[in-house]
Amino acid sequence: MQNFGIYIIGDEILSGKRQDKHLSKAIELLSARGLQLAWASYLGDIPAQITASLKASMERNQQNSDIVFSFGGIGATPDDFTRQCAADAAGVPLARHAGAVANIEAQYGEGAYPKRVLMADFPQGAALIPNPVNRVAGFSIHQHYFVPGFPEMAHPMMEWVLDTHYAHLFHQTKYLEQSIIVESGVESRLIDLMNTVITEFDVKVFSLPKLKPNPHVELGAKGAPDKVLQAMVALKAGVKDLGFTWRDFTAS
């Protein structure tokens, strides 16, 4: 099974100087195609940390397991480390990509030199990801897709990757998530019930407590639709047996 993951890179995100817009958009783009985000990591502008993280997910891809999007750090300023880190993680040198150079030259003419053209230095063997905004391409290597930190560029580039390379995965896995509200619920009293449902129905079970204004627990299951429906019957019966009342969850 292939998992989708994302890296969001940049000190400006971790410091709060910029608000992250990538996580919610990645979830939205994947969900629209019947896909799910399996994991997300935020990384600062620390080359050793970026390289180690990329190397770990690239090594997992020896089993063809993860499809990874990385947002940020592919520019040409001194705080943009992602291109070099990706090359180091892949065990290859940076090399100037002729197609990326051509795009930059077409966009900026003589202004491509001497600095903008640095953004055409990719890990050797990388493929291009077209940028519909300013033609400064992203790149991909080992099922890792590197795009700018600018949302207006990054998000259509992610869409292009999904629609071009992974359409065969769209809407392949049937998935359902359902939940109930357990009025005045106490999580510690629900643990045994949750473990029983996980074991019997092979689903993921979750509980989300809320203290104000009215204490309750959102209790639910997610996974294959038929198993989720069975699990919810068991959860509702179990909640009642524990002496709690419940109502169907309605998203606000």
Where on the chain are the PLM-derived regions?
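Glycine-rich phosphate/diphosphate-binding loop of Rossmann-like nucleotide-binding domains
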Residues: 1-40, 44-45, 229
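Glycine-rich beta-strand-to-loop/alpha-helix junction loops that act as flexible
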Residues: 9-11, 70-78, 148, 222-223
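N-terminal small/polar loop signature for handling phosphorylated ligands or for N-terminal nucleophile
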Residues: 27-89
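Short beta->alpha linker loops
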Residues: 42-45, 99, 117, 185
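An accessory alpha-helical subdomain
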Residues: 143-238
